[in-house]
Amino acid sequence: MDREEALERLRSARVGRLATVTPEDRPHVVPFVFAVVERDLDVIAYWVVDRKPKRTERLQRLRNLERNPGAELVVDGYDEDWRALWWVRASGSGRVVEDASDERGAALSALAAKYPQYASDPPSGPVVAIDIERISGWRARLEAPS
């Protein structure tokens, strides 16, 4: 899979898995919704702490990124026909976006454009950016084996 196909699959994915590193150097993986924004040569995946039920807005993934900004996100397509399988992995650095910034507004707009729930009930929690540094992907052969 080339970079453009990987980016398109990343942009169109409805849900992904976000991996961060805990203070104990253990992986912490959670499902999350996100929007990809491209500016010049930069690719950024944004997510926001929204109103879905949570114990706190100070999520483990936020604490992890404050300590170690390394992050990886994965999206994939599963099919019982394994010739249609694919995945995309994007690695980068996470950061909390400033509350009063233009970037926050752009991120929330991108999220609302992708997820109607955010348009009707705008989230007020922290916005997080993953500045993507590497993207790769794989897909199975679509043709039947001979």
PLM feature spans:
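Short coil-to-beta transition motif at edge beta-strands of beta-rich domains
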Residues: N68-G70
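Short amphipathic alpha-helical segments and helix-helix/interface helices
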Residues: A6-L7, L59-L62
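Short beta-strand segments
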Residues: R14-K54, L73-D76, W86
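Intrinsically disordered, low-complexity coil segments
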Residues: V37-I44, R55-E57, D99-A106, P145
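Residues at secondary-structure transition points
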Residues: M1, T56-Q60, R83, D102
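Charged, gly/pro-rich active-site loop segments
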Residues: Y78-S146
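Short, basic/aromatic recognition patches
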Residues: M1-R17
